[in-house]
Structure formats: C-alpha cells, structure tokens
C-alpha cells in the first residue's frame, strides 16, 4: 500500500469517487459500473518482431566465409603434404640439395595462411631475401603462389591478403 495520498484522517480521492458512484448506484438499484474497477488502463502488448540489422547479417556472412576459408586451407595443406610425401618416396636420392621447390614453397605459404591467415607483400619480400639470387627458387615461389591462387576459391581470396588477389588479377589481364 502506498503512503502517498493516504491519510488516516481522510480517505483518498479515488476511494471517495468510488464510494459516491456506489452510493448512487445503490440508491437507483443498479450495479456499480465497471469503470470504477478499472483504475489503470490495461497496457496493450505489442507483437514482438525480430529485427536483424544489416551489420549483423554481414557479420554472420563473414563468419561463415572465414570458417569455410579455414576449412579450405586445411584441405589444401593436407593435399600438399600428401604430394610432398609422395614426391619424397619416389625420389630417394642420397644427394639432397637445399633448394626450395614448388611444393616446399606451397607448404610454407599454407602454414603462413593457417597461422596468420594472410600472405602479405612483406612476407613475400622476406621470402625473396631468404632465397637470395637463385632464379630457380624465385620461379618456384611464383609458381607455388599462382597454384595457391587457383586452388583457393575466388570468394575467399580477399581474405588471404594482397599477394594472391594481385596474382589472379594480373593473370586475368594477360
């Protein structure tokens, strides 16, 4: 019971109004109106509608694309490792040169994609510094990157960084 509007010496205004209506209806023989019972209007409940912002849908789409991208990278990694194992089994030569070949570059690039999910120009420049002046290794690196650019779906290439996307765009121009 609220303290506001209540006093022991006099009744509140709502009680007085209800009492007057009840007295009038009692004298006329009619039941009190239902308006006296309804002190507060009923609150209408609105139907709840589900609103999804465009930002939320884009975020969900990006999450599904990145999940598919991670799955694709794992598949590419398994395939490349399988190719590398087959190659080493077929080629059991005691003399092994330390040059990187295409598959080794692909393994390195895929590991980089798995760890940081990006192949950037700075990574490419670091790889070129490690290679040095070896023309064969530079060609092997470019072939490996072109193969990766073809393996990874075009919808996901923008997630890999700027190298693979640039390679596919230059190949389309040629």
Swiss-Prot record:
InterPro entries: Paramyxovir_NSC. It comes from the Viruses. Pfam families: Paramyxo_NS_C (PF02725). Belongs to the morbillivirus protein C family. This is Protein C. It comes from Phocine distemper virus.
């Amino acid at each position: 019971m609220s303290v506001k509007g209540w006093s022991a010496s006099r009744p509140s205004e709502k009680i007085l109004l209800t009492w007057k209506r009840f007295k009038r209806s009692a004298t006329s023989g009619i039941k009190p109106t239902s308006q006296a019972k309804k002190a507060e209007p009923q609150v209408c409940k609105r139907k709840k509608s589900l609103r999804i912002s465009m930002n939320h849908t884009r975020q969900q789409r990006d999450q599904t694309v990145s999940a598919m991208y991670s799955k694709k990278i794992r598949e590419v990694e398994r395939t490349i490792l399988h190719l590398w194992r087959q190659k080493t089994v077929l080629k059991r030569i005691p003399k092994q040169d330390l040059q990187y070949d295409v598959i080794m570059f692909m393994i390195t690039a895929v590991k980089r994609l798995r760890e940081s999910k990006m192949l950037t120009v700075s990574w490419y420049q670091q790889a070129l510094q490690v290679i040095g002046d070896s023309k064969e290794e530079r060609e092997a690196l470019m072939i490996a990157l072109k193969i990766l650019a073809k393996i990874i779906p075009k919808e996901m290439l923008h997630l890999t960084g700027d190298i693979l996307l640039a390679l596919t765009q230059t190949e389309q121009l040629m």
